[in-house]
Amino acid sequence: MIFKQIRRLIAAALLAALSLPAAAQPLRQLVNVEGIRDNQLIGYGIVVGLDGTGDNSQVKFSGQSVANMLKQFGLKMPEKTDTRVKNVAAVMVSASLPPGYSRGQTIDVTVSSLGDAKSLRGGTLLLTQLKAANGEVYALAQGSVVIGGLSAQGKSGSSVTVNTPTAGRIPNGASIEREIPSDFEQGDSIRLSLRRPSFETATNVVRAINRNYGKIATTRNATTIEVRAPGDPTERVAFVARLEKMNVDVGAEIPRVVFNSRTGTVVISEGVTVRPAAVSHGSLRVVISESSQVSQPGPFSNGTTQVVPDSRVQVEQGQGRMFKWPAGASLRAIIDTVNRTGATPDDVMAILQALDQAGAIDGELVVI
């Protein structure tokens, strides 16, 4: 009798937990305000002051850039003069211009080698124009490049490279010269775009706004929500600030399994389960080895030494394994079981894809 009561209490607790609403999140984490976004800038420039690690003679455009720069300062080089030097590197400069930034403010820039420079460490980016997609100049970049990697090479040709020495950043390296206009202040309404489109989330956002401010929010699809806003710019900014603090129930999200095919990383969201399934998986490995045999002719035979290539191909068939799981098994437990058998990331991915094709995964499989 006591055990029956305990089982009833446990079942009631589980039902209560399942009936709880999804965790509410601030609206600022769910939506973007239309017209308030970053704008990408890009430019071409040169980095000088390198310790012999710049572009080699095969890169012609870096030498041409040096000649054009000297010409702007009134220095005309003789015709057919080779202006390619190893302490200069041609680079592409990119930056992200946040919304609302005004003239005189600074932003970080990323500097990346365009030629065959070995390292940008110790270099200085000369004044570079940063343009948007419309071709207009919005910022000017210049400064010392900060590199997180290194590269060293000995006289024998041996070298070592840590991280990426051909790309770096310049903190606060660009000054804003032109503001990007925004349509945030225009019209009698604002638009909110869900970062992850969902009909349920869009409906919950509209209900939450209308519950607090009256019938001012509408939606037509799973992404865009239109909200009537004050016409005065100061009041509109304060209104959006209040909206961003409002908590909204996002609803139930689709369970996902994300697999990175390059690194073998598997990320499993909460709620992913597997239906009854059995999987048999075997591994096939092909090994190709190359070696060279030297054929030496006999003395006084007027023959020549020949190098004969020798290729060996081996095919190894691994022992197949059978896996069987009951209904409702956690996918995390399944992957742990497969990993304990010594399976590689490719094996895990093959099993996940097979389960997904069989309709055994209660969730969405995403491969990146």
Swiss-Prot record:
GO terms for biological process: bacterial-type flagellum-dependent cell motility. It is found in: Periplasm; Bacterial flagellum basal body. GO terms for molecular function: structural molecule activity. It holds the Pfam family FlgI. The keyword Cell division does not apply. Keywords: Bacterial flagellum, Periplasm, Signal. GO terms for cellular component: bacterial-type flagellum basal body, distal rod, P ring; outer membrane-bounded periplasmic space. Residues 1-24 form the signal peptide. The basal body constitutes a major portion of the flagellar organelle and consists of four rings (L,P,S, and M) mounted on a central rod. Assembles around the rod to form the L-ring and probably protects the motor/basal body from shearing forces during rotation. Belongs to the FlgI family. This is Flagellar P-ring protein 1. It comes from Chromobacterium violaceum (strain ATCC 12472 / DSM 30191 / JCM 1249 / CCUG 213 / NBRC 12614 / NCIMB 9131 / NCTC 9757 / MK). The lineage of its organism: Bacteria, Pseudomonadati, Pseudomonadota, Betaproteobacteria, Neisseriales.
